[in-house]
A protein has these predicted regions:
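Alpha/beta enzyme core
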Residues: 1-53, 63, 67-71
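Conserved active-site-proximal phosphate/metal-binding subdomains
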Residues: 40-54, 60-128
Length: 130
């Protein structure tokens, strides 16, 4: 079992539950997120658990991979980066939206429910006033 964790507390809980490793995922990731940045979260989790830590969230190239290893991660997970791959069979409209997105083109919704989620800004999100 390798769960995704957004905090040190959850990483410790997953280790006690028998996880083989944890994926420490920062707020830069796409989809459901925690509140800690990847580069702050990873070394804290590394220091708190004895199992391998895999870094995730906002890692898109060799610099992010190298930084993750320098912070003690034993591996990295890249997600959004691969949405643009030819092999990825997502909707082409969404794929183009992700590829063309700039650094200010994402928005976090769901904070008021306790379930924050990073999304690409769209007309739909502006219409529902999230």
């Amino acid at each position: 079992m390798i769960p995704v964790v957004p905090s040190v507390a959850l990483a410790k809980r997953m280790e006690r539950a028998g996880a083989d490793a944890v994926i420490a995922e920062g707020t830069e990731s796409g989809g459901h997120i925690g509140e800690n940045t990847t580069m702050c979260l990873v070394p804290q989790v590394v220091d708190a658990v004895e199992i391998p830590v895999i870094a995730a969230g906002g890692i898109a190239d060799g610099r992010g991979i190298a930084a993750s290893f320098m912070l003690g991660a034993e591996g990295v997970q890249l997600g959004t980066r691969f949405l643009a791959a030819e092999e990825c069979q997502i909707n082409p409209v969404y794929k183009e939206l992700v590829v063309k997105a700039k650094d200010t083109d994402s928005i976090v919704t769901g904070r008021y429910t306790g379930h924050p989620c990073r999304n690409v800004k769209t007309k739909f999100l502006s219409l529902i006033h999230i």
